[in-house]
Amino acid sequence: MASFFSSAGSFLITVLASVFVFGIVIFIHELGHFLTAKFSGIQVNEFALGMGPTLFSFTRGGTKYGLRLFPIGGFVSMEGEDEESEEAGSFTKAPVGNRILVTVAGAVMNLLLGFVVLVCVVCSQQLISTRTVAEFYEGSSTQQSGLQVGDTIVAVNGRRCFIANDIIYEFARTQQGQADLTVLRDGKRVQLDNVVFDTYEENGVNQLVIDFKVLGEKKTVGSVLKEAGNWTLSLGRMVVLSLTDLITGRIAVNNLSGPVGIVSAISEASSLGLSSLLMLLALITINPGIFNLLPIPALDGGRLVFLIIETIRRKPISQKYEIAINAAGFILLIGLMIFATFNDITKLIV
């Protein structure tokens, strides 16, 4: 019986944590579109959080605000956004600069939310990890390869490291057990080629061994903001690199995760504490902030491409063509989500 209540409690925490994470990420994104549309004089017909049947709604200032049953999405419906409209306040009648602002605002809000969450994460830490080597473990392979105490790791394989976590991420990406490091030593840049680090296999996956510790520094207002900013840049770059690795085949497509995988990750993070959940929230909110700006039809980035073309041509592309292209992109994204969800379920079963 105790085991049952424990499992039920764990399930409830996962559900609540998932609703919280998805809800706040979607709400902030749509809020960006909503606020900039209102600021630009564009008529917003509806602002809804969630999908499916409406649980609660009210109308104010010509806009219907609603909460829907399934916490898996949300939307801002603007006049003339997806159909021809001659009404005052139509999206298509607004200056192209205003429409660009409305289009990118959702992604910008996601990135800002990620930064704010990361400020909270950094504040919860006792010290801020630097990129300066403090000590090595006994038999350290990196030390034997030339890395020294006091070295500040600037780049791995030519890619700049903003935070200590970047070092781990770049080591993991090499998949070769060695990397080229650029370090600051006594104020001078030193290049260390073929620095070896240990790996081991666990459940068919190569795991990385970091055989040194880095220095920690005390927190100040400036250092917290700087670290949170660097974390934001780092996570954003990780999203871009991961997408690039998927496209180039560096990472197998069966590693792609969808909503089920995200819920599983939220479950694990929530069991580890608030700090881990907040870190995952930061990654999940920065991810759509970057992904939504990709030039893919049906995404904000796809609409941005149309607006840029309109700016260059000085006239818009026919809306019927834009709608058709966006519909094709939407079908593609749904197919990708189904594939990712199938991957997630397969991993859970296996």
Regions found by a protein language model. Give the residues of each.
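PDZ peptide-recognition modules
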Residues: 2-12, 81-97, 105, 109-256
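Hydrophobic alpha-helical segments of integral membrane proteins
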Residues: 8, 47-48, 66-75, 100, ...
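Small-residue-rich helix-interface/hinge motifs
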Residues: 10-86, 294-313
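Internal alpha-helical transmembrane segments
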Residues: 17, 28, 39, 46, ...
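Alpha-helical transmembrane segments of multi-pass membrane proteins
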Residues: 22-26, 77, 110, 114, ...
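Membrane interface segments of multi-pass transport proteins and intramembrane proteases
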Residues: 56-58, 135-138, 307-324
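Transmembrane alpha-helix interface/packing and boundary motifs in multi-pass membrane proteins
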Residues: 245-249, 284-299
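Juxtamembrane boundary at the C-terminal end of a transmembrane helix
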Residues: 339-350
